[in-house]
Regions:
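Long, charge-rich, low-complexity alpha-helical segments
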Residues: 33-95
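Acidic, low-complexity/disordered tracts enriched in E/D and polar residues
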Residues: 1-45
Length: 95
């Protein structure tokens, strides 16, 4: 399980691309694909092997708090849970 201080990176054989047929982003890997919603794509766009989970949540919080509706703690919890789910599938690694 990832924590706020984990520095996630995509597995080297995984990549995010836009699927023209499905009209949405997908996380592709040799054994399959994960369809992404806008939130998942926004999170994975920030996964670069440099930012911590906390950094990613902070950037998203700044983006979404422009509307004043996003709780930073809730965003951190959601980002951590989402990336931990992908880490359990070995699509995300902790540096």
């Amino acid at each position: 399980m990832l924590t706020a201080t984990s520095v996630p990176s995509l597995w080297r054989l995984a990549r995010v691309e836009y699927d023209d047929v499905r009209k949405r982003p997908v996380l592709l890997y040799p054994e399959g694909a994960v369809l992404l919603n806008d939130t998942g794509a926004a999170i994975l766009k920030l996964v670069d092997g440099q930012r911590s989970v906390s950094d990613i949540a902070r950037v998203l919080s700044e983006q979404y708090n422009g509307a004043g509706s996003a709780d930073p703690t809730e965003i951190l919890n959601d980002v951590t849970a989402y990336l931990s789910t992908l880490a359990a599938r070995e699509l995300i690694r902790d540096q």
